Amino acid sequence: MSHQEQLHKPNRQQFSEKQFIAFAFNYVAGFGFISVVLTMFKLGPFSYLILGLAALGILGVMLSFSRLSIICGSKAYGGSYLIAKKALGVKTITARFFTFLSGWNVSLTGPFNGLIVPAVLVLSFADIKAVKDNNGALIGLLVGGFVLFGALNFISLFGLKMNKNAILFFAIVKWVVVLGGLILGIYLIGTNHGHGFVENNTLGEHIEDLSFLKVISTTVGMLVAFAGTEDLTAITPDVKSKNIRKCFLLMFGAVTLLYLIGFVIISGISGLNGYGLDGKEKNEKAINTFGSIYFQAGGKYLGIPLLVIFGLGFLLNSLASRLGMTITTARKYVALAQDGFLPSFINEQNKHHEYHKAVWASNIMTLAVMVLMIIVPFLPNDENPGKQLVMFDAISVLVEVAIELAVLISLIQYFITYIFFFMILAKKEGSASVSWWEIASYGVSFAIITVLLFVNLFPITAWKNTNTFKLSILAAFFALGIGFFIHSEIKHKGQLVKSVECN
């Protein structure tokens, strides 16, 4: 099929409203929350402030994206890329450049989030000392993660129908494990007579000193729990719905409610923050990860078997997320290819009606990120100069840096999308029905996003080697994108290939 036929081929809508809400809920909720929630209580009762700030920031983003889905419609792939086209147009090279940059930036979130899959096996078994201290076991788990990543690449080529079935299977197991952890958390609360509610909601001896930077860094961490909002706007053409805004808002409400319930339950567990159940000194009964809940609830005989079950569920969570990322990231590349910014073959579909070459492009980018991130363990140790990190700690730092990069890219996208959104509203397009509370939420959210972005781009603490590495990686990938843009300008002589645009 020719490029033009591919470009104008009618889109097969493969998600019903209910399926999309379920897909979106599973895509956003789960992995990020259980990865960061235990760190929230280092600030005691102010942890609820962190949850509130993160939720307010993302609520405004969600409302703006859902509002823009009404203004721009849902006939074409691209999400926030289409928003940039609507705000700036494509008549000048400057407008085309910033429009492309918006689309390129949002396409980077998937590859950086995808890095977590191979490492998640290692972190899942952190409470088993024989694994944590065994380099051979750690390498084996990492290799296993890469093999699973390759298997996911193969599955993702079989189209949304196949992917939906795979994601459903992974999601069922994932939620059994996540909800099982919360139930076991309630059991641990009972065994300690609810002492954790006092321990985690007061500024006790082991709670970190409250400061502006602590609040900012912890809020950024909490944003991981809501990651993926910007990705979902890229696949709206695959959704059969007359009110995509309602779908987004229902999903956000469900995610926030789940997090609030989970937050309350976990705040009642003793032994958080790396300290034992006595709260006096670090020991083996500390709740270091979500998996520790399984480990401690299982006791002497069932602790390791339950931890293995958690590890498998945590892995399936990552597999489901990776499949979802492949779907959304591929469609971001499709939008750029349709306009000629990327090679036209990326827009081709296979017999399963999947953009298979866009899927390969997504996977190649993820592999490139993985290769570059291998540098992280070999960076100079900021804590102990001249001393190399042990393998487990090095992997932990690698995952931490990858998460920080993914959040940073998301913050950049939220910031520039808000700028474009305000430009569109200034033109009085679709703004007649915007209520005052919605406008207020945009203002509060934009302020939160702006502070989080610039404090993380230019931290006012001691500069670390990982800060230099993060900025270098961002510069490298943006340079690659600029290369594609320059090639497109030369090839198409400053004209975009005709494609579907915002209404």
From Swiss-Prot:
<dbReference type="InterPro" id="IPR050367">
    <property type="entry name" value="APC_superfamily"/>
</dbReference>
<feature type="transmembrane region" description="Helical">
    <location>
        <begin position="166"/>
        <end position="186"/>
    </location>
</feature>
<feature type="transmembrane region" description="Helical">
    <location>
        <begin position="20"/>
        <end position="40"/>
    </location>
</feature>
<dbReference type="GO" id="GO:0005886">
    <property type="term" value="C:plasma membrane"/>
</dbReference>
<keyword id="KW-1003">Cell membrane</keyword>
<feature type="transmembrane region" description="Helical">
    <location>
        <begin position="43"/>
        <end position="63"/>
    </location>
</feature>
<feature type="transmembrane region" description="Helical">
    <location>
        <begin position="106"/>
        <end position="126"/>
    </location>
</feature>
<keyword id="KW-0812">Transmembrane</keyword>
<keyword id="KW-0472">Membrane</keyword>
<feature type="transmembrane region" description="Helical">
    <location>
        <begin position="249"/>
        <end position="269"/>
    </location>
</feature>
<dbReference type="Pfam" id="PF00324">
    <property type="entry name" value="AA_permease"/>
</dbReference>
<feature type="transmembrane region" description="Helical">
    <location>
        <begin position="405"/>
        <end position="425"/>
    </location>
</feature>
<feature type="transmembrane region" description="Helical">
    <location>
        <begin position="443"/>
        <end position="463"/>
    </location>
</feature>
<protein>
    <recommendedName>
        <fullName>Uncharacterized protein MG226 homolog</fullName>
    </recommendedName>
</protein>
<feature type="transmembrane region" description="Helical">
    <location>
        <begin position="215"/>
        <end position="235"/>
    </location>
</feature>
<feature type="transmembrane region" description="Helical">
    <location>
        <begin position="138"/>
        <end position="158"/>
    </location>
</feature>
<comment type="similarity">
    <text>To M.genitalium MG225.</text>
</comment>
<keyword id="KW-1133">Transmembrane helix</keyword>
<feature type="transmembrane region" description="Helical">
    <location>
        <begin position="301"/>
        <end position="321"/>
    </location>
</feature>
<dbReference type="GO" id="GO:0055085">
    <property type="term" value="P:transmembrane transport"/>
</dbReference>
<feature type="transmembrane region" description="Helical">
    <location>
        <begin position="468"/>
        <end position="488"/>
    </location>
</feature>
<dbReference type="InterPro" id="IPR004841">
    <property type="entry name" value="AA-permease/SLC12A_dom"/>
</dbReference>
<feature type="transmembrane region" description="Helical">
    <location>
        <begin position="359"/>
        <end position="379"/>
    </location>
</feature>
